[in-house]
Amino acid sequence: MKTLFDTKELLNEFDINLIGIDEAGRGALAGPMMMAACKLNKKLDGLCDSKKLSEKKREELYEIIIKNSNYLILAFSSEQIDALGLSTCLKTGLKLIKKHFKTENNFLYDGNTNLGINGIKTQIKADASILQVSAASILAKVSKDRVMNFLAKDFPCYEFEKNKAYGTKAHKELIAKFGICKLHRKSFKLL
């Protein structure tokens, strides 16, 4: 019996039972990290790694994905990340995803480790080749960006609507100028 990972040809074959998992904001200096899991109801066109899509295209695909899937989006605040650490937040997210999809057992997480959570397969760059992981990538990224756009209104000096809280040169210069705000991750090297 062939499995999803038997041949390269199968990477592009659609498996209706597969649940893709990805996160966005893992390396951001502020704001939440979002995790998403997605089980598509049908094959959707145009899906790929969210980082390779324009913001407009991600937004369009987000709406299509949520109408054609069973999905879960989780948020881990900067306070949770500082208190628990990234690994614990990621493990918690994977456990919550498994609990949400309790009758399912075909999970694929983008990356090289399942953090010790049984029943979750991993694949590096799965968001670029597996539709369900691409969909999860888009759900997580759009959710993260929407949160940062909303939070930017309360913290305009950090330009979160532009940098989405990632460690860009401009963002680091703003931290140096204004100091940190309550959204910044104190456990991260910010400068």
Swiss-Prot record:
Reactions catalysed according to its record: Endonucleolytic cleavage to 5'-phosphomonoester
Cellular localization per UniProt: Cytoplasm
Co-factor remark: Manganese or magnesium. Binds 1 divalent metal ion per monomer in the absence of substrate. May bind a second metal ion after substrate binding.
EC number per UniProt: 3.1.26.4
Any one GO MF annotation of this record: manganese ion binding
An annotated GO cellular component: cytoplasm
Xref: InterPro entries: RNase_HII, RNase_HII/HIII, RNase_HII/HIII_dom, RNaseH-like_sf, RNaseH_sf
Transmembrane segments: none
UniProt enzyme class: hydrolase
Pfam families in UniProt: RNase_HII
Residues involved in a divalent metal cation binding: D22, E23, D110
UniProt xrefs under PROSITE patterns: RNASE_H_2
Name of the protein described by the UniProt record: Ribonuclease HII
Source organism per UniProt: Campylobacter jejuni subsp. jejuni serotype O:6 (strain 81116 / NCTC 11828)
